[in-house]
Design a protein with these regions (language model features):
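N-terminal loops that bind phosphate or other acidic moieties
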Residues: 1-162, 169-358
Length: 358
């Protein structure tokens, strides 16, 4: 393992023990795709080239992981100036270490053109205007997640769970605040539109009449959070679980703590760019929720010859589609160097750039 690239945070000893326990594990990745109409608030996210494309972002990520190209749109999900989806990093990590994956549709507006588990959930509503989903639907989402968790988890395996949901940091912020956790959040942009997010959250919090966990997610969240929390709740009883992501996974963790999970088997895995985000106070947020390991990976994108990849280290995108957790698993399983991983990422970037221009 490259000690300079994979780092332990929070409870350092616990994080190192968790990493050591993974050395001989088999990894499986679960990508949970979803949608919240909160993402359609102008200026709140960079995920997707424009409002009309937002609904395609998550299914396109799922298709890209499976096929190497997207079917619901003509290119891969990119920002207006061509910064690539973090699913590029995820795909390279999975392919290079031969890590299998599956997709869960947890309320995506568009169903992906690839095999997947379908929750039959509706997408989340704009939380500044109404509750995301009914309490009954949140309970159904949790139970669906638990079924997935029981079905796919095996001892001596590590399950990595990632998400793809535009605007998800805003619903995550609302959920954290709803649970009384004092925090800020990360963003897909270097200048975090925190005023827009805070106003959105403030509008949503006015409706909150109960701190019952199901009610908090119903009023303030999105469909991804209860599904992933359900998966974590059951999977962590059986095997190690890495919540692969940033702010959204802290919201999952906060909800999971209230419905039950095994923290001894749980860690958060993310890119170092989440921890570099001064606005997010990520480690402090995790510490407020529970004492679990945080593991980060630096994919050395600041050294890339491509501006689109370097942008990750400059504050754009930072994380998503389970990229950080998958790169951690890939490096542990394949024993490749970080330089080799960067070389493979650049090779894939060149390939998809050619797809985009055709």
């Amino acid at each position: 393992m490259d000690e300079l690239v994979i780092s332990s945070h929070g409870n350092i000893e616990s994080a190192k023990e968790f990493i050591n326990s993974l050395e001989k594990s088999q990894f499986t990745f679960c990508l949970v795709i979803s949608y919240t109409e909160t993402s359609e608030i102008p200026g709140i996210t960079i995920a997707g080239a424009d409002k009309e494309f937002l609904k395609f972002t998550s299914p396109a990520d799922a298709e890209f992981l499976r096929h190497g190209h997207c079917k619901c749109i003509d290119s891969i999900p990119m920002s207006p100036d061509g910064k690539p989806t973090p699913a590029l990093l995820t795909k390279v990590a999975l392919d290079s270490a031969k890590i299998p994956h599956f997709v869960v549709n947890a309320g995506s507006k568009i169903s992906p053109d690839t095999s997947h588990f379908d929750s039959q959930l509706e997408f989340g509503k704009n939380i500044s205007e109404s509750k995301a989903l009914s309490p009954e639907k949140i309970s159904e989402a949790v139970e669906f997640g638990k079924i997935i968790g029981r079905s796919i988890s095996q001892p001596n395996q590590c399950l990595i769970i990632g998400e793809s949901i535009p605007g998800g940091t805003t619903t995550a912020l609302a959920v954290l605040k709803g649970f009384g956790i004092n925090t800020s959040v990360s963003s897909s942009m270097p200048k975090n539109p925190i005023e827009i997010k805070n106003q959105t959250v403030s509008n949503a919090l006015k409706r909150l009449k109960s701190d019952d966990p199901i009610n908090v997610i119903s009023e303030l969240g999105d469909p991804m959070i209860p599904v992933v929390a359900g998966i974590l709740s059951e999977s962590s009883k059986i095997t190690r679980v890495i919540l692969a992501g940033g702010t959204q996974m802290t919201a999952v963790l906060a909800f999971a703590k209230r419905i039950g999970y095994n923290k001894q088997n749980t860690a958060i895995g993310c890119t170092s760019y989440i921890l570099d985000d001064g606005d997010a106070k990520f480690l402090e947020t995790v510490k407020q929720i529970d004492d679990i390991p945080v593991i980060s990976v630096n994919p050395l994108l600041s050294e890339s010859k491509f501006a689109g990849l370097r942008s990750y280290s400059e504050g754009f995108v930072k994380e998503g589609a389970g990229a950080g957790g998958c790169m951690i698993a890939s490096l542990l399983k394949s024993r490749m160097t970080s330089e080799k991983l960067l070389e493979l990422i650049e090779k894939e970037y060149q390939r998809i750039s050619a797809l985009k221009s055709n």
